[in-house]
Amino acid sequence: MSNTFTQLYVHVVFATKVRMNLIKPEYQKQVYEYIAGIIKHSGSHPILINGMTDHVHLLFRYKADCNLSSLVRDIKSGISGHINKNGWVAGKFEWQSGYGAFS
């Protein structure tokens, strides 16, 4: 499909398990940078990543052949592992199941 051009933008929102305030300001920047890396690795382009202590907002341009559900799964899984590995929360960090996506 050499004559095809797409620009697909999506706003994704997801929250911590039971909306607990676990994404502390001390490491929010590192969390957002890690998420940006996962998005870039997928071939998509992060535009803005931000949030609060209990949820995250992502705005990115994604490739037409990108599976959004798989990408969000990879982001949530990757950042959970990163937070747990660094010991930034007492106990186990988890996300709520599901997400919102708007284009």
Protein language model regions, located:
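Basic nucleic-acid-binding interfaces
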Residues: 1-103
